[in-house]
Regions:
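A conserved ligand/cofactor-binding region detector
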Residues: 1-808
Length: 808
């Protein structure tokens, strides 16, 4: 790759100029935040310059543009990633060290952008990285949340949500583009007019806001392509401040329009338990969809005029889950109401342009909206959805015996609700799942009626991760070792990692793999001491489960294992375990009481075990607050056991399993999601698999013969003891007992089969950890996992999307 700075001296000269211009001080007199701001502004300027060249090249080559719509983009810190992708990280680090600075400290000043929460948003970010690497003209389209989901704090063991003030010191990567703002209307009423035999529609009396875009450059590895992520912020139409109201003491009312508009883009996933929250969520979804569709059509028109029938040739619109489901009807609205196309012509364009990724298995978890809410807030869009639904229903031959049930399952409007997944499928030419088992379940269960009607639409695209961020950037010690062994071509093509299998018999190399892991464990231990005040031993096994908290992900099963090991150690002097640090991290949705109770239980157990001198030399429990990309990049490289223990058939794919595998952790998991493909690639002998399979789960549920009380009563000494401890005060010292968890397991009959899989899980854990003292074989399996993980690069996933869905 061609470097953007020809020498260290040239970089130093320009960097000093930026520092002086932005801080008014010499480098030696600045703080690390000053140094970060100057460096990020400098690199962002370089990136925007390459972005302009990328846009020009795309126009000249007539490239098809891919617009990736997602409610989340969890992009993480960008500075280190961009220095790596531009090929200048070593040069910059050396130059700053020569100036008396520390690049690592400078990079730590960067906030984690609160533009997403979990796997959905991180997947979208990895896809943007890979689109840029692959030279695809790819554009992210999302929301700019002022406060994100929330910043998680732990107070007396409980999750407490506080606003994430990530923008408080500015964000040097973004550029506001008020010239590209789009007017968005809510509410109002539909007005029709007749022209010949055609009816045309508009909406009057709307409550309008401005969607204002902020552009963030997405630098591809090699520095040849820089794409854009466009995030929309809601602002009032008129920046009107009511001075009379202010002088009369109505300080809130004086700026009410701004407050109401900005609320739309204030936080990710507003609590939708009440009508106000539901309206806010629906406004968010429409705002970023409508603004994005308007913008891409404007771009198309500048380059191709009003040749709308050519749109599918030059544009692909991809919807990441159902939050952008209104892409189809909004595109219909503009093509018909503003451009004068007939329904049939507009529909032909929509269904050849839009594609949809499903991330959900459970039918009850699919997004739905009350018709009353939807039709009031978005009357014209609802009219179009109603017509799409009517035409869909007309396609059924109701004389056929299966038609009634198929219509019920596939209709967009049903039982007073707008079903967004059905809307997404009907408006798309492609529907994909995100792991082989997930795609099979979609066709066999969740969306089986659509699959029966249109089997050619359905395909699988197993998720992937950015190996440059989550391996090269996150794990520099291991990455350096890999590069010494096989060269650096793996940065460009992760499939090259498979060459590492040649070193599985090299004792010296395996020892260095172990030394790299220990260095990463020390780094994480220092972070835990600094952030949590807890001392953890880097010579213990690091057993890691880090992900969003949800019942089906079964963090409860994990902490029950810890409770069991604790009890057995105290009760049986002959019982021995491999010394282990159990590491948890992740957020629970603010309204998800059960998940928050599991977090409280983990911290309650940690409070007891970490303060019990009888065990805390062999057991520690660590909950790392506020899981985000930056601390994930410390956790993944240090992990030795990757806990992927969802109830079989519930996890669509997962990506933490891939990140942990790539960093040399061994998977302890069920045959669910992408775990199945990990086992296929790395071999069952190099992982630890337990528990019921998806068919076994389905059969057990169908039998009606699962009774939680029977499971517990058959094992009073171990399971019975754990269940009792939830309510007998054993772990209540920090914040009380855990009656709701006890009730969920025993009186709601343990829906996620925690008790059923318990013994299989603990046995698998004991068997796996018993092999830990054989360092050479453990390191061999760790290296083998890394070697076989290249298939999970998001570069591979994006090539499949490009070739098989977008045809870009």
């Amino acid at each position: 790759m061609e470097r953007i700075y020809e020498s260290k001296e040239r970089f130093t000269e320009l960097y000093r100029q930026h520092v002086r211009a932005l801080s008014g001080k010499e480098f030696e007199d600045t703080s690390d935040i000053d140094r970060f701001t100057a460096l990020a502004n400098m690199i962002a300027g370089d990136a925007r310059g390459i972005s302009a060249l990328t846009d020009e090249r795309n126009r000249e080559e007539g490239k098809k543009r891919v617009y990736y719509f997602s409610i989340e983009f969890l992009i993480g810190r960008l500075l280190d990633n961009y220095l790596l992708n531009l090929g200048i990280r070593d040069l910059v680090a050396e130059a700053i060290a020569d100036m008396g600075g520390d690049l690592d400290e400078i990079e730590r000043q960067e906030p984690d952008p609160a533009l997403g929460n979990g796997g959905l948003g991180r997947l979208a970010a990895c896809f943007l990285d890979s689109m840029a690497h692959e030279g695809i003209a790819g554009y992210g389209n999302g929301m700019r949340y002022r406060y994100g989901l929330f910043k998680q704090e732990i107070v007396n063991g409980r999750q407490v949500e506080v606003a994430d003030e990530w923008l408080s010191k500015g964000y040097p990567w973004e550029v506001k583009r008020p010239d590209k703002a789009v007017r968005i209307g809510f509410g109002g009423h539909v007005v029709s007019r007749q022209e010949g035999d055609r009816s045309f529609y508009s909406v009057e009396g709307t409550d309008d806001v401005l969607a204002v875009p902020y552009d963030i450059p997405i630098v591809g590895y090699g520095g040849e392509t820089v794409n854009k992520l466009r995030c929309w912020s809601a602002e009032p139409i008129d920046d009107h401040f009511d001075l009379d109201a202010f002088n009369a003491g109505d300080y809130t009312g004086a700026d009410r329009d701004r407050a109401n508009a900005e609320a739309i883009s204030a936080i990710l996933y507003p609590n939708d338990a009440g009508e106000h929250g539901r309206l806010l969520r629906l406004k968010q979804e429409y705002l970023f969809v409508a603004a994005g569709i308007r913008t891409l059509l404007d771009t198309f028109e500048r380059e191709h005029g009003k040749a709308w029938s050519e749109l599918p040739r030059f544009v692909a619109i991809h919807t990441n889950d159902t939050h952008p489901a209104m892409c189809g009807p909004e595109l219909m609205r503009i093509l018909m109401d503003e451009e004068g196309l007939t329904w049939d012509d507009a529909w032909e364009i929509v269904t050849n342009t839009v594609s949809y990724t499903n991330h959900t298995i459970l039918p009850e978890a699919l997004e739905k909206w009350p018709i009353s809410t939807f039709s009031t807030l978005l009357p014209r869009v609802y009219q179009i959805i109603d017509e799409i639904n009517r035409r869909w229903r007309e396609g059924f031959d109701m004389s056929r015996p299966e038609s009634a049930e198929r219509l019920r399952a596939t209709a967009i409007l049903w039982d007073g609700e707008v079903r967004m997944a059905n809307l997404s499928v009907i408006c798309s030419h492609s529907v994909n799942g995100v792991a082989k088992i997930h795609s099979d379940i979609l066709k066999a269960s969740t969306l089986k009626d659509f699959a029966a009607l249109k089997p050619e639409m359905f395909n699988n695209k197993t998720n992937g991760i950015s190996h440059r961020r989550f391996f090269a950037e996150a794990n520099p010690t291991y990455a350096k070792l890999v590069t010494e062994a096989i060269g650096d071509s793996w940065l460009d093509d992760a499939r090259e990692l498979e060459k590492l299998t040649a070193f599985e018999g090299d004792a010296s190399f395996l020892q260095r793999v172990g030394e790299s892991k220990r260095a990463n464990k020390l780094r994480l231990a220092e972070y835990v001491k600094r952030e949590c005040g807890l001392t953890i031993d880097p010579d213990t096994v690091f057993d890691v489960q880090v992900k969003r908290f949800h019942a089906y992900k079964r963090q409860l099963l994990n902490i029950m294992k810890v409770m069991d090991l604790y009890n057995r150690h105290l009760n049986d002097p002959n019982f021995k375990i491999q010394p282990t640090t159990f590491i948890f991290s992740g957020k629970a949705a603010s309204s998800y009481t059960f998940a928050k109770e599991v977090i409280r239980l983990i911290n309650g157990v940690a409070d007891v075990i970490n303060n019990d001198p009888r065990v805390n030399d062999i057991m520690k429990v660590c909950f790392i607050p506020n899981f985000r990309v930056s601390n994930a990049q410390l956790i993944y490289p240090a992990a030795e056991i990757s806990e992927q223990i969802s109830t079989a058939g519930k996890e669509a794919s997962g990506t933490s399993n891939m990140k942990l595998m790539m960093n040399g952790a061994l998977t302890l998991g069920t045959m669910d999601g992408a775990n199945i493909e990990i086992v296929d690639l790395a071999g069952r002998e190099n992982e630890a698999i337990f528990g019921l399979t998806t068919p076994e789960v389905d059969a057990l549920r169908a039998s009606g013969q699962y009774f939680a009380w029977d499971i517990v009563n058959s094992d009073r000494p171990r399971l019975g003891r754990i269940i009792d401890q939830l309510v007998d005060g054993t772990f209540a010292g920090l914040s009380g007992n855990f009656e709701s968890i006890h009730h969920e397991l025993m009186f709601n009959n343990d829906y996620d089969l925690v008790l059923k899989d318990f013994h299989s899980y603990v046995d698998a854990w004991e068997t796996l950890t018993s092999t830990y003292p054989d360092a050479r074989d453990w390191n061999r399996r760790a290296l083998h996992n890394t070697a076989m993980s290249g298939w999970f690069s998001s570069d591979r996933t994006i090539r499949e999307y490009r070739d098989e869905i977008w045809h870009a």
